Amino acid sequence: MRFQPPEDIFPSVKDWLELGAESKRKGIYKSIYPHFYLKKRVKNPPVRYPIKLAEGYAAIIPGGRVWGDNGAIVTPENKLIWDVSLEWVKNKWDHSIFKMETLPPVTHHYDAIADLTHVGSRNYYHWMFEVLPRLHLIRESGFTVNRYILKYAPKHSPFQSETMTHLGISRDDIQKTHRQFHIQAENLIVPSQPTFVTKWAYDFLRNSFLTENKLNPSINKRIYISRRETRRILNENDLIEFLTGYGFIKVELEWMSVAEQVQLFSGAEAIVAPHGAGLTNLTFCPPKTKILEIFPSTYITGLYWLISALGNLDYYYFIGASEQVPNAQQWHGYDNLTIDMKKFSSFFKNIGIK
């Protein structure tokens, strides 16, 4: 059976339950974690206060459908649910599902299937904070699950298989999405899809990967994280020479397992790094760890400042001169940068690392 693209959009699962058709009566919505307001902990943060962190919930959509590689959620009335179908588009109507003339034939599943898809699943930050915590919400809900739907590419992103195995999910439990993917479940279980750092996700990651592992802290206490691809520091050799004088060592996280990264960060006392997904591991740092994040002038975000605030870390940031990468499609998140070492040296000496 083929479907036309959705006829309309519900902003959220809760809106579908309140405004949808008769099928809503069979839907179930469980709020697991309420909204959380973050208290101010650092001076001059890179984002504005107050910070309202999203609610965590899990819901059952009887007869719900999942379409495409990114896992768009469609109701039995053929309407897209936006808050669990996010794509990086400016307008909701630019979602890829609306560019289809017809959708692929649907496969019916007469059991309970849980959706864990996310457009950014191949990125370490998005996987750790916006995919894995959804599994936690499902478990907290008490809903029975037969299989999980994932945007899953462990050969490209080995952290996916390592973390899923650690959390007790085997390859046989996973159904991978693809461009022609289109299923309808007897009971589609849909947890909320975080779009930013949340306290409950932070706590879940620490409880799952730090406490349970009982890791021995790394002997490397002062760490500089180097990037091999985008957002590189073009005069990095000058920076490394400076930091070496303060006992820092250079690491490349791309070559490390998740367990090794957790161990490294759990024993750190100071970390310097250009902005990048590896700083997701600040989640595992002990309180008061000094963090110095380096941004290009064209791309500044409060993502890792927020993780630092949740962990009571001593966070600072420094802004370098940006240089746009060719063919970056005008998105400045890929920009490389150059550091004015005279300014950096003065700034560094004022943050208390001796």
Predicted regions and their residues:
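The feature primarily captures lumenal catalytic ectodomains
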Residues: 1-354
